[in-house]
């Protein structure tokens, strides 16, 4: 492959207190936490919406709201609240989640699974970010890190508006891939490939019958049952 030397150019600059790279759930919570403490915060996300794997992967929130099943003898109680629980609470108000449901099988890394409506999740998190005054930079790619003497001073972004430099006092890498850290020169290891997995949603079927069929063929690895429509919380 040939190399191309890009000519030097001047780009617009903005300054904030905190830059959060990645708008998945971790990035949303980090940006909200910073903004709610009074920090001028910018959230950079390359998709046109927030939510990351929860919204595009159909994974629900394997949320670590508690891990009592993975550690026998640990008290059964909710240990994570704060902003994550605020998101769930607001989703419940608009019918966007069935709430925390206890894992019945496959609880080696969580004890509850929180299924969400992906479109309402996008709406709720975007609304919360706007309410907190976070500068949303959607459809924006993290192109590079600006590093001086081993310290990240800023980032270069690319969007439909062109390239931009953002300088800040603090940076959070919530890309899921360590993109900001890698661009800044941090060591990293290429992960092993993960098998492709698909999620699906179905309606007007017998959940019990489907589960019985899967269980009879030893095809159930994880099992969690949320509230049905109309059931009390």
Model segments located where?
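Conserved beta-strand-loop-beta-strand element in the redox core of flavoprotein oxidoreductases
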Residues: 146-165
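Glycine-rich, N-terminal phosphate-binding loop of Rossmann-like dinucleotide-binding domains
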Residues: 23, 159, 175-176, 184
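N-terminal Rossmann-like FAD-binding beta1-loop-alpha1 element of flavoenzymes
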Residues: 18-42
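Rossmann-like dinucleotide-binding core of oxidoreductases
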Residues: 66, 178-233
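Conserved N-terminal/central alpha/beta ligand/cofactor-binding core
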Residues: 7, 33, 39-40, 45-144, ...
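Extreme N-terminal leader/targeting segments of oxidoreductases
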Residues: 1-18
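Core beta-strand elements of the Rossmann-like FAD/NAD(P) dinucleotide-binding domain
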Residues: 14-16, 161-170
């Amino acid at each position: 492959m040939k190399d191309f030397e890009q000519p030097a150019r001047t780009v617009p600059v903005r300054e904030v207190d905190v830059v959060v790279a990645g708008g998945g759930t971790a990035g949303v919570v980090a940006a909200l936490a910073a903004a709610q403490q009074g920090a001028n915060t910018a959230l950079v996300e390359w998709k046109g919406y927030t939510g990351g794997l929860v919204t595009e992967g159909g994974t629900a929130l394997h949320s670590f709201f508690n891990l009592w099943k993975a550690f026998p003898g640990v008290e059964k109680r909710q240990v994570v609240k704060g902003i994550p629980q605020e998101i769930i609470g607001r989703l419940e108000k608009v019918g966007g989640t069935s709430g925390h449901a206890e894992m019945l099988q496959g609880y080696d890394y969580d004890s509850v699974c929180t299924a969400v409506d992906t479109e309402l999740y996008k709406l709720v998190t975007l609304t919360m970010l706007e309410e907190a005054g976070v500068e949303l930079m959607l459809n924006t790619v993290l192109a590079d890190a600006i590093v001086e003497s081993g310290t990240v001073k800023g980032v270069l972004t690319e969007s439909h508006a062109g390239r931009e430099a953002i300088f800040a006092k603090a940076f959070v890498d919530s890309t899921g891939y360590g993109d900001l850290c890698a661009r800044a020169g941090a060591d990293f290891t290429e992960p092993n490939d993960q098998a492709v997995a698909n999620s699906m949603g179905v309606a007007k079927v017998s959940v019990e019958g489907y589960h019985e069929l899967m269980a009879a063929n030893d095809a159930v690895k994880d099992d969690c049952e949320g509230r049905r429509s109309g059931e009390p919380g």
